[in-house]
From Swiss-Prot:
Viral particle assembly takes place at the surface of ER-derived membranes in close proximity to lipid droplets. NS2 associates with E1/E2 glycoproteins, NS3 and NS5A, which interacts with the viral RNA and core protein to promote genome encapsidation. The nucleocapsid buds at the ER membrane where E1/E2 glycoproteins are anchored and afterward associate with nascent lipid droplet to acquire APOE and APOC. Secretion of viral particles is probably regulated by viroporin p7. The keyword Membrane applies. Residues 1-52 are cytoplasmic. The lineage of its organism: Viruses, Riboviria, Orthornavirae, Kitrinoviricota, Flasuviricetes. This is Genome polyprotein. GO terms for cellular component: host cell endoplasmic reticulum membrane; host cell lipid droplet; host cell mitochondrial membrane; host cell nucleus; membrane; ribonucleoprotein complex; viral envelope; viral nucleocapsid.
Amino acid sequence: RNLGKVIDTLTCGFADLMGYIPLVGAPLGGAARALAHGVRVLEDGVNYATGNLPGCSFSIFLLALLSCLTVPASAHQVRNSTGLYHVTNDCPNSSIVYEAADAILHTPGCVPCVHEGNVSRCWVAVTPTVATRDGKLPTTQLRRHIDLLVGSATLCSALYVGDLCGSVFLVGQLFTFSPRRHWTTQGCNCSIYPGHITGHRMAWDMMMNWSPTAALVMAQLLRIPQAIMDMIAGAHWGVLAGIAYFSMVGNWAKVLVVLLLFAGVDAETYTSGGNAGHTMTGIVRFFAPGPKQNVHLINTNGSWHINSTALNCNDSLNTGW
């Protein structure tokens, strides 16, 4: 609704300016006012749809949280070497958003290359936007930030300034407040896919590329029961206060968002959906045909016999010989 006021001010002001144009001001002003009324009708429809559905009163704050789930598919990085630009997977300094002791938050489409000592090595990509030193996610630091985020959101909602806080959060994404902790370079040419690439891994990544938001939400839904136990045992008071407040006011959509946000930081995080990929691999292997050997019939002087040693390269791979 607050955004609608800004849009109405712009459209109505534009219509008034069109009306002051000599000779053609009357028809242009009328058309511009009709357009402004049409925009107002669309805004009323959006306000009704998002404000009257049970548990779905989306505000700018909720849209700010949902904006964190999108992953641009066209992200790419280049490295400037003596005037020549080379496409690389290494993150430039402009792609680094936040740095912790053992984790780096960056924009999608690259992997940080950190210079430590006298060597540069690639960090392990845990998610499209988070890389760690050894592939293990430091859940303590991230969950501390989630506590602060949810606690701030709860306070903003209790004070009825959720739209203002949401606007501040959106503007805050344009700036970096933390100091640099690591020396990132572009001399590694890191791989987006660490480890052994299998067909199941490629199929899983293809599914995530089709709908990264849906894949992320489904993976987090399966972690909610364990996340509830973790937030109680770990005394995450910000998250608990947020869930309690939003439950009391009947805002179940925000309760679900808080649970998904906390469940996204799991103590047993695997690289690029490796947990679900490993489970799916075990199911698919049950239907695998297994090794086989083709039987070859050889005609020698008019008589047929079986030659079991006539193996080609593919047979050798299937049988293990």
